């Protein structure tokens, strides 16, 4: 196992905001063969989650080779094996690995994704990706725009407003808003009940809790939250208080950005507004295709699985991927079990 960072769980340790907790209940966020401590809270704070991962590594004696960057992996047809070239980042010494099996577990979050917007490079204020955002404490009194309405974007907007920033958020696409209690119920019920029935329940209850949000710029997708997650990997937003601040006008909602000039952002319908800073909560992208050769049996041009979940994890010639299906920790655990069982069944010394 090679890892380019100097620690495990570098995203959680170094590239997450201070108030982050797991958005799903702990029973849906466990890795194989190890539960959380019995006294752990239902929704795990990030520091406790990192501790869980540290304990997992220690318990199963996992020994990653840190600060080792993969440069290329290719399949040798003649030798029927994978050849991987890596480099130790501390010494620049090259290392070669030969293996019968290769597991791509570099994640969906390998690189920040910031969309191309006309004029962005000339923006007069600070522009950061959500991976660099820590707290709204330094933004008090500033006009801040959050781009992206997933869980990170909505929670960052709430954090900014709570610290006194004049906060706006760009909501470009339909999105489901639910409570953490509702999504926990839904994920429990769907194990025994058809997904369309559970989705109907979730939508009805969410409408009861939040009311009609379309007048505030938030429109629900046509597909239900669980089916949408299963089909596209897009998660429902679990409200932490953002909706209330949108309703009372504390957080302003805008549509798509047309262009930026100086510190002025022009939105669709020619609406313009000045901002001091912009936070892009626009997700991440896979970089697997930059180093994986002969992976076309498994990954598309974006470095994500070609096949739909749950048949996405296996390619040709002993190639596998884990954690690329946009299914969170539960999906990672499923991938790990499927891959381990498949390797075990096909391994003949």
Describe the function of each predicted region.
Residues 7-35, 56-59, 63:
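Redox-cofactor-proximal catalytic regions of oxidoreductases
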Residues 1-11, 41-151, 155-349:
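Flavin (primarily FAD) cofactor-binding/catalytic cores of flavoenzymes
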């Amino acid at each position: 196992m090679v890892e380019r960072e100097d620690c495990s769980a570098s995203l959680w340790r170094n590239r997450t905001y201070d108030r982050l907790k797991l958005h799903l209940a702990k029973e849906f966020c466990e890795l194989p063969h190890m539960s959380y401590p019995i006294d752990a809270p239902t929704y795990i704070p990030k520091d406790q989650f990192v501790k869980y991962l540290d304990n997992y590594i220690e318990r199963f004696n996992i020994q990653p080779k840190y600060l080792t960057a993969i440069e290329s992996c290719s399949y040798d047809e003649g030798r029927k094996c994978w050849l991987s070239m890596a480099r130790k980042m501390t010494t620049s010494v090259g290392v070669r690995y030969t293996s019968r099996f290769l597991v791509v577990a570099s994640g969906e979050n390998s690189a920040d994704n910031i969309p191309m917007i006309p004029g962005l490079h000339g923006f007069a204020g600070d522009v950061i990706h959500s991976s660099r955002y820590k707290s709204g404490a330094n933004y008090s009194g500033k006009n801040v725009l959050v781009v992206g309405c997933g869980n990170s974007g909505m929670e960052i907007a709430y954090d900014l407003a709570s610290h006194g920033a004049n906060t706006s958020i760009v909501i470009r696409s339909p999105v489901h808003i639910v409570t953490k209690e509702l999504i926990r119920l839904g994920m429990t019920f769907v194990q025994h009940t058809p997904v369309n029935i559970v989705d109907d329940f979730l939508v009805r209850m969410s409408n009861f809790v939040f009311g009609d949000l379309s007048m505030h710029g938030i429109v629900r997708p046509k597909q239900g939250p669980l089916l949408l997650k299963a089909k596209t990997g897009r998660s429902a937003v679990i409200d932490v208080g953002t909706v209330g601040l949108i309703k009372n006008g504390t957080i302003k909602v805008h549509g798509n950005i047309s262009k930026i000039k100086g510190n002025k952002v022009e939105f669709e319908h020619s609406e313009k507004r000045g901002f001091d800073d912009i936070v892009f909560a626009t997700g991440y992208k896979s970089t697997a295709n930059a180093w994986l050769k002969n992976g076309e049996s498994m990954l598309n041009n974006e470095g994500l699985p070609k096949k739909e979940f749950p048949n996405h994890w296996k390619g040709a010639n002993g190639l596998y991927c884990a954690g690329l299906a946009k299914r969170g920790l539960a999906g990672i655990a499923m991938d790990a079990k499927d891959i381990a069982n498949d390797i075990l069944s096909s391994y003949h010394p």
